[in-house]
């Protein structure tokens, strides 16, 4: 059932709807307040039940269902917008790739307030990344040439002893797994 107000005056209750036709099944991870994954595996056209969130300012990463690739990042300034005690709906809308969709509107997150009116666009934030360089310095003959993987995705093939990769971007503040296998 739809809500017009939060179940607690200190919270903002948020209903989430996935309405972006070219976006994959996604997770939403909150990265500023440490809330972690708040929406898990939501496909296009589905709703996630109400999230009863303490009214605060959040930073939301939209990730693929595996949680490894960040598609976009948005601010959700619930406290700044003084939304305590309210219930609202956040919709993912638009296209991740507008060029493949007749130049349609770009992907974004929008808030429908209980009072109605024009949807409120959540601000896009820069995706946090870290610069990583891989250096092969293992003198073991069995590891003279190796393949390097980042989160189960091939990163470097045929990587030789005493070589260094160029710097690459990796998710900042995230745990990731680096795998090494014989080439």
Annotate the PLM regions.
Residues 1-183:
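Intrinsically disordered, low-complexity polar regions and short flexible loop motifs
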């Amino acid at each position: 059932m739809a809500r017009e107000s939060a179940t607690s005056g200190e919270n903002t209750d948020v209903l989430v709807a996935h309405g972006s036709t070219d976006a994959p099944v996604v997770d939403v991870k909150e990265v500023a307040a440490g809330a972690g994954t708040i929406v898990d595996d939501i496909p296009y056209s589905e709703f996630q039940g109400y999230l009863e969130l303490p009214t605060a300012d959040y930073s939301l990463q939209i990730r693929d269902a595996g949680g490894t690739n960040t598609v976009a990042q948005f601010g959700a300034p619930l406290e700044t917008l003084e939304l305590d005690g309210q219930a609202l709906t956040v919709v993912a809308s638009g296209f991740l790739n507008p060029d493949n969709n007749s130049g349609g509107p770009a992907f974004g997150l929008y808030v429908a307030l209980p009072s109605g009116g024009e949807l409120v666009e959540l601000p896009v934030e820069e995706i946090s990344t870290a610069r990583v360089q891989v250096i092969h310095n293992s003198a073991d003959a069995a590891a003279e040439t190796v393949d390097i993987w980042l989160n189960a995705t091939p990163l470097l093939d045929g990587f030789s002893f005493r070589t260094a990769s160029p710097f690459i971007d990796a998710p900042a503040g995230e745990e990731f797994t680096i795998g090494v296998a014989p080439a």
